[in-house]
Amino acid sequence: MYTARKKIQKDKGLEPSEFEDTVAQAFFDLENGNQELKSDVKDLYINAAFQMDVAGNRKAVVIHVPYRLRKNFRKIHVRLVRELEKKFSGKDVVIVATRRIVRPPKKGSAVVRPRTRTLTAVHDGLLEDVVYPAEIVGKRVRYRLDGSKIIKIFLDPMERNNTEYKLDTFTAVYRRLCGKDVVYEYPVAETA
């Protein structure tokens, strides 16, 4: 029998939480109810999901998907997020790929750590996933006198209408995932 449990695959020995079951059920309902998304959602599943509070009494749903299915999720990202936001009654939905950080190899060992498993690469990848469908067109790091730093991310102004209302959500989700403070802006186009 095909059930919503097929839509979530956790690591061995872990049981999905109640909220993760709710998200898996939403995916299952999309596959069975929505004709335009049916064929695209059929082979997709999630790894984990959690809900978090964002400033201003809003909530965000963060869904972790397998890294190798990232491309397939990106093809239908806009439609999928719109449908999921309807199902979760106005909560912002953010889809990120599950990535792993591997510790640096010990001195003298012959093991080479892939670039994609470094902390920097994982945090940059998560940042790209969080702001998708907008593209990052620039990045500035500002160091304050007290030693703290603020990362300014410039997003593609073409996607301003689709993403501007979610900037608080993007900031809160990235802070929760990586522990870094980020400020999002849209660069002003210079007229010559």
From Swiss-Prot:
It comes from the Eukaryota. Keywords: Ribonucleoprotein, Ribosomal protein. PROSITE patterns: RIBOSOMAL_S7E. It holds the Pfam family Ribosomal_S7e. GO terms for molecular function: structural constituent of ribosome. InterPro entries: Ribosomal_eS7, Ribosomal_eS7_CS. The keyword Ribosomal protein applies. One of its GO terms (biological process) is rRNA processing. GO terms for cellular component: 90S preribosome; cytosolic small ribosomal subunit; small-subunit processome. The keyword Ribonucleoprotein applies. Belongs to the eukaryotic ribosomal protein eS7 family. This is Small ribosomal subunit protein eS7. The gene is RPS7.
